[in-house]
Amino acid sequence: VPRVPTTADVNNPKRKGYDFRLDNLLFRTATSTDRQLVIRTAEFPNQQIDLRQNPEDITTNIGQIFSRNDFSGGQGLDFAHKRNNVEKDTTRFFDSKGVDVFHGDDETSYNVHLLFTTENKDVKGTTADFSSTNNYLIKTANNNLYVSDDTTIYESTDGGDSWNAMTPSITISYAIQGMAPFGNGFFFVTGDGSTGKQLCHYTGSAWHVESLSTTFSGYFTGIWYEKDKLIVSGKSTTAEYLFEADPFDHSFSFPAAGAIITTDPDYKFTSVTDAGAVILAANENGKIYSLKDVTGSLQLQGQTRIPFEEVHSIVASEGIVFFGTKEATRDVGRFYKAELVTADNLYVLANRQLIKEWVIDSIDTTPHAMFASRDSVYCSVQEATDETYLWRYYLPTAGFARDLKLGAGGLCYGISQGSGKFVASISGKNVYKETSSYESEGYIITPNIDFFTSEIKQWVGTTVEHDEITDSRRIQCFISTREGTIDTPGSSSWELTNDSTQGFGGTEFQINRNARYLNMKIVLTPTIDFTGTPVFRSVSARALPRPQLVVIDIPVNISDQVERPNRKRIKVRNLGETVYQELKQKEGDSVTLELYDPAELIRGVVESVAYPVINHANIGSVTQYCTVRIRGVRAEDITSEFTNIIGIGTLGVVGLG
């Protein structure tokens, strides 16, 4: 009875005249000049997905294009092509440093440029740092700036450029614990950590130690001025208190029984802000309290708990509340936004959304100070022992990105502006002010790009466009095909492609990389004297599909006659029919095809088995054959991974078969 031989029956099948195997079945081909074995790449199907990122990507060039000409959506996008992408993602990127991606302060068309640096203003007149850590920074109505250091207050009347120690006519007996601007002057409170305390007032010309009648037994820990009221916090051995006071009545009383809020003494109030309908007070106990003015007095009218977190800063802008927290058990900082809503006559924060989390070993990344401008909210975050950054939330696009770099590491105790420039106080360090010199380098890192497919692509080229460069400014584009490279801006995996030192850019640089992903880092460098910045407009990358699918057409010998090398041919009745029926049974099945010459290993499916054809050659024997079509992908033989192992690679498989 004829049957189809298998690999278990035949050793070294190639030597015995077999040309290929399907799984474990062995077959002979019937190739000749008019019936060839053909291996070809399958046509790449058109994807029914619009992969253009922007309307500008409509082009006559072949391939798929990713581009960014607007980065105002902010950072944090790690993969550009995801199933749950939203419209905003077309303007987002992964990370940036030293560049302004929002362009909110200029009246020119959108572009990306370098940010200004900041400089140490040497408040104490020398290179010495502050002597304490409670370095509160405020700005009064006449644009003067003040910063505290232990019991000393320094004043700047020129927007923070120069500072002088003030000589008050009063004795500041204890360390300053908080300052609140009031007109051209300010109130401040002191405390010694026990029961010593003062409430003081500087009018802009005169100093006063306010009279305290009935007070709690403890010391002051903070002061704020909101809705024409002074909000004062204090701590005793049994509780932390929050009081209200009238700044126009110079007879102050802070009895424990008169506190608006009484909380656990292990925590303190950290920040207070006017949120419109109510005043919000943040506490390290993870609660945000809502204080409403009822017939002239503040009353607790709701509270919101942030589980397992300490709230250290809070500000409200355009009806949105922003607050910064620290995880209760780790130095992990988080930045949230929420909405103030009314529920059963109580004011609470709802729709809370985490915007950013900072996890850096051995660094307290708590957003410790906030500042609200016309279109943005800024918070400060320490990211290294010698680096603190302002992060900017841009209200028009809800984008969030790193902004100015402050020249020291530490918690920020105040952010303000002087003469149109940012001024910030770093605890235990100094005051830093924005300059008119650009950063020495800035970058934007794009998300990973894969055009919604896991297949390998042929990355053809990258293009960078910018304003004309005629001097020492420079824009470079680096690429990587490893998705994890975006986490490390200084990685050696970044490869330079575009390097623009003159002209407008716009030239596609060939990159010739085969990979699933591509990501890009665009680096901006200023003029030699740091007075000019390059103006970056857009970046794009183009890829061609790299089909891995192949189609193989094999003419299979289904004759009854068997021809073997160096052997006499024999005829086996019904052998051809048996072979043909075996092939028909494989139709539609997944198989592994191994061709012996040329050596190919393909895993796929038997797409079709054609009807038998009898070929009457002019010279030679009559051959009956059928054409088998297999569609699949090339695969590496698993044994090739072990070619260094004696008995498998050297002798057992590769050498002897």
Task: Show which residues each predicted segment covers.
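Beta-sandwich interaction modules
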Residues: 479-546
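A short beta-strand element within beta-rich, extracytoplasmic domains
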Residues: 453-471, 475, 520-524, 534-541, ...
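Short Trp-Ser/Thr-centered turn/loop motifs at beta-strand boundaries
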Residues: 127, 167, 211-213, 245, ...
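Leucine-centric amphipathic alpha-helical interface motifs
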Residues: 4, 10, 39, 66, ...
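Blade-level signature of beta-propeller repeat domains, shared across WD40, Kelch, NHL, RCC1
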Residues: 409-448
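N-terminal beta-propeller domains
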Residues: 2-167, 185-208, 222-259, 269-278, ...
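Repeated scaffold domains used in trafficking and secretory/extracellular systems
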Residues: 126-140, 171-184, 214-228, 262-276, ...
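Extracellular/virion structural assembly segments
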Residues: 545-657
